[in-house]
Amino acid sequence: HAFHDGIGVEADAAEAVYWVRAAAYQRYGEGMHRLGVCYEYGDGVEQNWERAVHWFREAAESGVSVAMADLGYCYEKGCGVEQSWEQAFSWYRRGAECGYPVSMSNLGLCYKRGYGVEQNWQEAVKWYEQGAQCGHLQSMNNLACCYEDGEGVEQNEERALYWYRRSAEGGNGSAMCNLGRCYKRGYGVEQNWQEA
């Protein structure tokens, strides 16, 4: 990161990639993931989604949970691989089971929408809850939506408002809008146009 971010040295993308590549070739998980990110964004190398997927897969198979999420994203969007919700679901699940909150949120979405798996609201709520408990802001917002709409859980205005507020206070824009809507409508709180 020193050469990439210019920490203690002048920033040098080519030098950063040299060292990241050296770490990746030594089978260092974080190095493999970072090299995948370089290829994903064209950071110090020419952008190449197929190479990004290769290194995400190598890192994911070595146990790097963020690489599992990134590989799931590639399958979800069809970047560097043929689009496959089943593969996206599989990698999100592996990342979630390793404790990575972004994967928990994405896995919840798969269960909510039936992407790559049979729709299951209770499983969606379970994974949103786990992501929220880890401090993941989007998971908090998604969980609040479930409580607001009574999807996968019993409708509960207080819980919806609680999770919207926590997510909004953390900076999640969607949660800010949802919290404002609650104040506008008087949902779970006294109607307050100024607060909205």
Predicted regions: what is each one?
Residues H1-D5, M32-Y41, D70-K77, M104-R113, ...:
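Hydrophobic face of amphipathic alpha-helices that form TPR/SEL1-like repeat modules
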Residues A2, E190-A196:
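Low-complexity/repetitive intrinsically disordered segments
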